[in-house]
């Protein structure tokens, strides 16, 4: 409601809440910081886990920042913006989601301190933008170039990523699986590696131990052979990929046939049978002995395929068909009549095997396959889910290094270097923007501070010590949380991709976006019956938008 010439003017519907200026900024900063604090305790090798229980009672126990934020039910728009930070980090770099969110939350906390000193948001925004740009330049300067073909470096990168996750006890095996998988699907274009992670499939089966997980240089499909008389194992497989049904096609128009005698019925059925037999005959003539079909296979077609000794699998997912094409060199055909011997792929073995009481098809021994499968085993569903999350992060960071050929020391070392260098840069800029740049630099110390805090170390003592040694001994000095002391991360093989840290610093954009908001208009949201939200923060909730998690 507003007033003009003493007359009240109703603009917004009843129940709408509006927050303007400092109130809007504080409320948004509070919501974003709550998200950052939620995941902060999971950061680093000594980070804690979160137990997430959904409305159906299903439980997820993890310390993966992206998974936690994806599973939390959020209502506050500023909180959702922080989730977008994590999603972008995961998509662009594959790791460092918690780091990105924690940095964004700390930048907002430091911005609030400046707001309390009556520094205008525009000045803070400009200072943060200058600092973020400078930080990116510094990261490029301090990055260590590595050989993308150096397996030892790739293994160290993968192990650093897995360290601290629930699958850590098998990090050597999992790192090896991740590196081998990425190297197998990597392709060189214009002298640089390009890795399409869609060509790495994760297939999970509960049972056995994690140590039984393996890399299949081909494709594993959760299907079974369609007919009991078909072979269960084919060596020297010539593989046909068909994305149409091996069935008699129905006409597009509703036609009716009047059958007046048994002979006509027999003739009709014989024609159907001939059409199906012709399809199978054509497949056999091409030399194919294994057929994967994206759609259905008629019972009669199954019978004829079995007579020819051809293994057939039906209703294969489109994504699996594409991986089979990449692995075996086969071409996917849309019409059986168009199938030629040149369209067939090759694998040394195609076999149906029983795993955890279920049949699965293994396509192995492909010639230089550009699609592979990591078969994940583990005692329970929770275990294999955590192993899958660890492997997903590991393959992404290995991809980063193979494509960029650049790494940084981990253990908070790059953030300490940035904090020192950006603080020096603030002195060159001067003016009120320098205050924002100094606060930006100070905010970056939240990463080494949190690593120490989560390891149960004295944060003040270790932070002073590590910054001092970093200045004296070089940019490799970070915090070894296992030894509880400053150490050279490069010497200890604790490294991370340049891309992860660069993308995490870009989280400053989210902080800038939130600081730009000075007016929030929130419509009243009707809450479903029987659903209770968490209590509002001291500053209140936004127009029916609770802080549910």
UniProtKB/Swiss-Prot annotation:
Gene3D superfamilies (UniProt xref): GroEL, GroEL-like equatorial domain, TCP-1-like chaperonin intermediate domain
Claim: Nucleotide-binding is one of the keywords in the record: yes
Single GO term (MF): ATP binding
Region annotated Disordered, chain positions: 529-549
Transmembrane segments: none
Keywords per UniProt: ATP-binding, Chaperone, Nucleotide-binding
Pfam families found in the cross-reference section: Cpn60_TCP1 (PF00118)
InterPro entries for the chain: Chaperone_TCP-1, Chaperonin_TCP-1_CS, Cpn60/GroEL/TCP-1, GroEL-like_apical_dom_sf, GROEL-like_equatorial_sf, TCP-1-like_intermed_sf, TCP-1_chaperonin, thermosome_alpha
Family: Belongs to the TCP-1 chaperonin family.
Quaternary organization: Forms a Heterooligomeric complex of two stacked eight-membered rings.
Physiological role: Molecular chaperone; binds unfolded polypeptides in vitro, and has a weak ATPase activity.
Entry-linked NCBIfam families: thermosome_alpha (NF041082), thermosome_arch (TIGR02339), thermosome_beta (NF041083)
Protein name as annotated: Thermosome subunit alpha
Underlying gene: thsA
């Amino acid at each position: 409601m507003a007033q003009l010439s003493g007359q009240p003017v109703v603009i917004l519907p009843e129940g709408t809440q509006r927050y303007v200026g400092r109130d809007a900024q504080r409320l948004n900063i509070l919501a974003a910081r709550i998200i950052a604090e939620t995941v902060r305790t999971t950061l680093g090798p000594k980070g804690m886990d979160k137990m997430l229980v959904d409305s159906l009672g299903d439980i997820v126990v993890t310390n993966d920042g992206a998974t936690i934020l994806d599973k939390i039910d959020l209502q506050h728009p500023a909180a959702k913006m922080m989730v977008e930070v994590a999603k972008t980090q995961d998509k662009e770099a594959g790791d460092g989601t918690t780091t990105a969110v924690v940095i964004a939350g700390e930048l907002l906390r430091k911005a609030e301190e400046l707001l309390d000193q009556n520094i205008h948001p525009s000045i803070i925004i400009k200072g943060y933008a200058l600092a973020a740009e400078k930080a990116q330049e510094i990261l490029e300067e301090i990055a260590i170039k590595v050989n993308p073909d150096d397996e030892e470096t790739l293994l160290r990168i993968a192990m650093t990523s897995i360290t601290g996750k629930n699958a850590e006890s098998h990090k050597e095996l999992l790192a090896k699986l991740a590196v081998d998988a990425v190297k197998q699907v990597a392709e060189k274009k214009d002298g640089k590696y390009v890795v399409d992670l869609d060509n790495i499939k994760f297939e999970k089966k509960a049972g056995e131990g994690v140590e039984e997980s393996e890399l299949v240089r081909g494709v594993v499909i959760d299907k079974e052979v369609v007919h009991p008389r078909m072979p269960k194992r084919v060596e020297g497989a010539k593989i046909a990929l068909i994305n149409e049904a091996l069935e008699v096609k129905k006409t597009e128009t509703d036609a009716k046939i009047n059958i007046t005698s048994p002979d006509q019925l027999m003739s009709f059925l014989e024609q159907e049978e001939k059409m199906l037999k012709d399809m199978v005959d054509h497949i056999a003539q091409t030399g194919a002995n294994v057929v994967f079909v994206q759609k259905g296979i008629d019972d009669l077609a199954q019978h004829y395929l079995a007579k020819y000794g051809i293994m057939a699998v039906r209703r294969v997912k489109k994504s699996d068909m594409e991986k089979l094409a990449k692995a075996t060199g086969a071409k996917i055909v849309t019409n059986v009549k168009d199938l030629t011997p040149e369209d067939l792929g090759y694998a040394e073995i195609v076999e149906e095997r029983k795993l955890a009481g279920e049949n699965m098809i293994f396509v192995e021994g492909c010639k230089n396959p550009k699609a592979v499968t990591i078969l994940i085993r583990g005692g329970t569903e929770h275990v294999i889910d955590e192993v899958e999350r660890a492997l997903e992060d590991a393959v992404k960071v290995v991809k980063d290094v193979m494509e960029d050929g650049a790494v940084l020391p981990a253990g908070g070392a790059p953030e300490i270097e940035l904090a020192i260098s950006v603080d020096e840069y603030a002195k060159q800029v001067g003016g009120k923007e320098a205050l924002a740049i100094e606060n930006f630099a100070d905010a970056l110390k939240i990463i080494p501070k949190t690593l120490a805090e989560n390891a149960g170390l004295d944060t003040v003592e270790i932070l002073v010590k590590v910054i001092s040694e970093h200045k004296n001994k070089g940019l490799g000095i970070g915090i070894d949380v296992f030894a509880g002391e400053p150490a050279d991360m490069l010497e200890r093989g604790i490294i991370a991709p340049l891309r992860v840290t660069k993308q995490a610093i870009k989280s400053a954009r989210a902080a800038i976006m939130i600081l730009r908001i000075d007016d929030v208009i929130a419509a009243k949201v009707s809450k479903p019956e029987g659903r209770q939200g968490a209590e509002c923060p001291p500053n209140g909730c936004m127009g029916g938008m609770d802080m549910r998690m």
